[in-house]
Amino acid sequence: MKAIHFGAGNIGRGFIGKVLSDAGIKVTFADVNKTVVNALIARNEYDVNVVGADCVVEKVTNVTAVNSAGSEIVKLIAESDLVTTAVGPTVLNIIAKTIADAIELRLNSGNKFPLNIIACENMVRGTSQLKAQVFKYLPESLHVQSDQTIGFVDCAVDRIVPPAEAGETDPLAVTVETFSEWIVDQTQFKGEIPTIKGMECTDNLMAFVERKLFTLNTGHLITAYLGVLAGYETIKESIEDEAIRSDVTAAMQESGEVLIRRYGFDPQAHAAYIQKILGRFANPYLRDEVDRVGRQPIRKLSANDRLIKPLNGTLEYGLPNGHLIKGIAAAFLYKNDQDPQAVELQAMFAEKGLAATLAHYSGLAVDSETVKLVEQAYQSLK
């Protein structure tokens, strides 16, 4: 079995690419980083430092790479069995045309074997969003045929993979936590679902997408924003502050009540899931910087992301949300001159104030009681 994986960064190599290679799949990474691509071509392997209660180095083999902006990639995709991505939402739109060209080549050459595409991104139904972009480039005459043999499979992914340590000279060096979760929507595959250890199938994906979004992502981000305010550099330092840990735990409990109401998660099991995540945040072997976790605040304040979506769930079910509101307020105190979204958010905030800015990016009503509560929380955080 052959797979193309877009994104040879830390998540690509340390998570998805590793899972595929461990399953005996030949993986070709597609990326624009020539240093990483050339190293993968030269070595055909790399080491992953897996850290947790036990720290081990695991070798990933049977891999190579290709420039994702070159002409070769289209033919490689057309001849593959699986395409995965870990590139981020912005780049996902950029690679859509390449994937469309490959599907067109594949179908026009008479290849009727199934091809499944899985976007492993921090997005809700990211593969469905990718499909919408691909179909903009794919000739309309091929849409029906594509739907018969090309599967666009949504998933939920979870593994903390921080950037390489400063001073690291090996372009393929990567460190990951022990925990990983990759859950795919089994209803969207075309043909036989491949058996891949570390890839779990479900017919109720949204429950797991929102469990991860409302718990790991929500907790991670609020830890980062409160950590920045307290002067910490890392998630570990932040979550070891009892006041921050208390706020983050309470925020995850608030979002958890939404999940319990919506999907019927067992309350005790979900409480244990929250505790596991808090333990992951405190992993002493991961240098997970608050500036990295906090970046792109505009995207993270959007209606379907990790702050506003659980908040809207609490409003839907009439549940407490004070700690989620505190986390949203903290986003407006996040300043990072290296992050265009943080700069844009602060510029609009300075010009129009919190209520108008929050309403603009989140979809919340500017005159709502919720927005007023965020304003109050902001004042108490300043």
From Swiss-Prot:
Keyword Oxidoreductase assigned: yes
NAD among keywords: yes
Domain of life of the source: Bacteria
An example Gene Ontology molecular-function term: mannitol-1-phosphate 5-dehydrogenase activity
Gene Ontology CC annotation, any one: cytosol
SUPFAM superfamilies, A to Z: 6-phosphogluconate dehydrogenase C-terminal domain-like, NAD(P)-binding Rossmann-fold domains
Record-linked InterPro entries: 6-PGluconate_DH-like_C_sf (IPR008927), 6PGD_dom2 (IPR013328), Mannitol_1_phos_5_DH (IPR023028), Mannitol_DH (IPR000669), Mannitol_DH_C (IPR013118), Mannitol_DH_CS (IPR023027), Mannitol_DH_N (IPR013131), NAD(P)-bd_dom_sf (IPR036291)
Catalytic activity: D-mannitol 1-phosphate + NAD(+) = beta-D-fructose 6-phosphate + NADH + H(+)
Record EC number: 1.1.1.17
Biological process annotations from GO: mannitol catabolic process
Sequence positions that bind NAD(+): A3, I4, H5, F6, G7, A8, G9, N10, I11, G12, R13, G14
A Pfam family of this chain: Mannitol_dh_C
Keywords for this protein: NAD, Oxidoreductase
Enzyme class: oxidoreductase
HAMAP family linked: Mannitol_dehydrog (MF_00196)
Family membership: Belongs to the mannitol dehydrogenase family.
Protein name: Mannitol-1-phosphate 5-dehydrogenase
Protein's organism: Psychromonas ingrahamii (strain DSM 17664 / CCUG 51855 / 37)
Gene name, Swiss-Prot/TrEMBL: mtlD
